[in-house]
Amino acid sequence: MWRPEFIPFLRSRRISLNIDLSLAALLRRSSNIHRRRERRVYNEVLSTETRAKRPSYDLQNFHFQSGGWMTDDSAERYDTQVEVLLNGAANAIRRQALPQLHEAFAGRDQRKLRLLDIGCGTGRFLDFVKQTWPRLQTIGLDMSEAYLKHSQRHLKRWTRTGLVAGKAEAIPLPDNSQDAVTNTFLFHELPPKVRRITIRECARVLKPGRPFGNPRFTPTRRSSRLRRALRALPAELSRAVLLELHY
């Protein structure tokens, strides 16, 4: 039997409500998700309109998730899904880059520094950066207009923060213009060739000797326990939920 105590993150009443709503949405779509998985359907978001706006690798249902990374619904559920999967540790993983940035920024005037976050998603990492360096000039780059809209909402209390729609493999910024480049949970979604191009682009826009932050996560015993708990659900339903939660 799945119980909230499996996940300390769920003990917050407000967060629990958000997760309940997110999981409820997953359950409503579970049969469609299961059919998508069984039929290996992964490109429902591909259309003539989207093909003109995005590279082919981005036009798929990532992890069989409904809408890929393209819809408001996906952006609304994203943070909850990642927190559940990582047992409430997603923000801790994001903060792993802060000590490296602190070392790089030590003794320097933050007002004169610039940071670029590629694949900024819903803006959670940039919010941590601004909490630490509120006068730092930051830019968030993402291909998803829906996710950028949520970033704008999360970052609205800050100044000196910009958001740009664009590809990480074609960063629309000048050479040697950034004092730091960061990303979280991006590279495993990119094809190998695009990863290499993206790394070269990051090196291009970075000033010499400046840091590239790439926090990562590894599966834990607790996340495995969550998976076991979800498997207590009916087989088709648990597979569907895990597919949408998988990251």
Where are the regions that the model predicts?
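A short acidic, Gly/Pro-enriched loop at the edge of an enzyme's catalytic core
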Residues: E169-V181
